[in-house]
Design a protein with these regions (language model features):
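A short, proline-enriched helix->beta-strand linker immediately N-terminal to the Walker B motif
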Residues: 152-156
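Conserved ABC ATPase "signature" region
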Residues: 110-128
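ABC ATPase NBD coupling module
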Residues: 66-80, 104, 109-110
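Conserved ABC ATPase signature
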Residues: 133-137, 141-143
Length: 291
């Protein structure tokens, strides 16, 4: 189920232009990552997909249908949404949180609860946590519940707004790997927002680097962007999030490519194990999108 932005702009009442003439195709069953600094319009773009924000001009199409003609509430209920800090209802159990949207769409309680328990398995949580409340969970567990809730109605589209930004680095790495596993198994159309270029390169099949006003500085596969930054802005953006190093790619044998920093030292290797791009730095390998 592809998503298409056609010349979309968003101007707020105070005159702020959050999005200026933005066009993009989000391919079906792939992960597209919108990455940029604060004020780049990435979250506004995400929120326009499920009509939490309305474009000032332009069109957004889902499966070739203009969502401006869709009723907002039913639209939102068929699109998964995962946010930072999980957004769980504190007075409801884990089971009830995950089962909320299915129940709202008319699924009987027993079936909704069974689906919720299955999703706890899917996101790697013990079913014994089902009767706990969010405050009784760790930050990583809360985020996993948030992902389970986003998947509860088996949506074709999953929107993720900096979902791992509030957890510690170790938990974040675990959650990123879990998302890669889930996407490999489920094949959703994922739109993921982050300010972290490393996270974008790790998770994205398509990475879209944004400047102010959601102007596209560069879009493409992580390997393409690393090999050929489109501008000084892109090169700088990549360098800042890598300890102010500018990375370039030297091609090696086969599908491997050597990452070289600005001083000429090797920073890692891009490999393609099993057809998926990965970063290999020292002895650690992390998946990074379809090659």
């Amino acid at each position: 189920m592809p998503i298409e932005f056609r010349s979309v702009s968003k101007r707020f009442a105070d005159g702020t232009i959050a999005v200026d003439d933005f066009s993009l195709v989000v391919p079906s069953r792939k992960t597209t990552v919108l990455v940029g600094s604060s004020g780049s319009g990435k979250t506004t773009l995400l929120r326009m997909i499920n009509r939490m924000e309305t474009p000032t001009s332009g069109q957004i199409l889902i499966d070739d249908e203009d969502i401006a003609h869709a009723a907002p509430v039913p639209l939102r209920r068929r699109i998964g949404y995962v946010m930072q800090n999980s957004g769980l209802l504190p007075h409801r159990t884990v089971l009830d949180n995950v089962a909320t949207v299915p129940r709202l769409t008319g699924v009987p309680r027993k079936a909704a609860n069974e689906r919720a328990l299955e999703l706890l398995d899917t996101v790697g949580l013990d079913r014994e946590l089902a009767r706990r409340y969010p405050a009784e969970l760790s930050g990583g567990q809360q985020q996993r519940v948030g992902v389970a809730r986003g998947l509860a109605v088996d949506p074709n589209i999953l929107l993720m707004d900096e979902p791992f930004g509030a957890v510690d680095p170790i938990v974040r790495a675990d959650l990123q790997q879990e998302l890669l596993r889930l996407q490999h198994e489920l094949g959703k159309t994922v739109v993921f927002v982050t300010h972290d270029i490393d996270e974008a390169f790790l998770l994205g099949d398509q990475v879209v680097i944004l400047e102010k006003g959601a102007r596209i500085a560069q879009q493409g596969h992580p390997k393409e962007i690393l090999a050929n930054p489109a501008s000084d802005f892109v090169a700088s953006f990549i360098g800042v999030d890598r300890g102010k190093r500018r990375l370039s790619v030297d091609h090696l044998e086969g599908d491997n490519a050597l990452l070289v920093d600005g001083a000429g030292y090797a920073a890692g290797v891009l490999t393609a194990p099993g057809g998926r791009l990965a970063y290999r730095i020292s002895d650690k390998t992390v998946q990074a999108g379809d090659a």
